[in-house]
């Protein structure tokens, strides 16, 4: 009975994200808030994949037990030509995959590429790990995974 109560809300989160994506004409399954992403991961219904660079994960932090497939590499953020193959090797094309980057922009591009490659349930984590820039040109003061107090660690 408790399991059903957990499954119902997370299923509803995905359906709502799909509906919003369809209305917006997004080329991937949709976007979810950091809080909804964490609920989906905790329920076991989704896998979280961090698409930031190794350097970002090392110096800024990362979500425990998240997978890592870099969308781009190095300080110049050169696109990883193996991204789709690496993602498929780690998740398969039919898993519910939540992609996380710094602010939600790169992960949206990664979600689009994955969807074009045949991933059927790939979602963007809105706001990203650090969030959007504020008026002072700093991240983390108004939104993002860390701002919401969700689990993260740093090397």
PLM regions: where:
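Rhodanese-like catalytic fold shared by cysteine-dependent sulfurtransferases
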Residues: 1-46, 55-96, 107-155
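Structural scaffold elements adjacent to functional motifs in cytosolic proteins
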Residues: 48-50
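Short, surface-exposed ligand- or partner-binding patches at beta-edge/loop junctions that are enriched
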Residues: 99-100
């Amino acid at each position: 009975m408790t399991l059903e109560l957990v499954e119902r809300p997370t299923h509803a989160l995905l359906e709502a994200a799909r509906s919003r994506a369809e209305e917006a004409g997004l080329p991937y399954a949709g976007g979810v808030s950091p809080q909804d992403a964490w609920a989906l991961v905790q329920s076991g219904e989704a896998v979280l994949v961090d698409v930031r660079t190794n350097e970002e994960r090392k110096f800024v932090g990362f979500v425990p037990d998240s997978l890592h497939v870099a969308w781009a590499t190095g300080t110049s953020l050169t696109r990883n030509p193996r991204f789709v193959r690496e993602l498929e090797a780690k998740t398969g094309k039919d898993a519910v995959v939540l992609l996380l980057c710094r602010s939600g922009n790169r992960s949206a591009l990664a979600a689009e590429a994955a969807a074009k490659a045949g991933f059927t349930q790939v979602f963007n984590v809105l706001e990203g790990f650090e969030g959007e820039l504020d008026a002072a040109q700093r991240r983390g003061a108004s939104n993002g995974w860390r701002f919401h107090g969700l689990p993260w660690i740093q090397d």
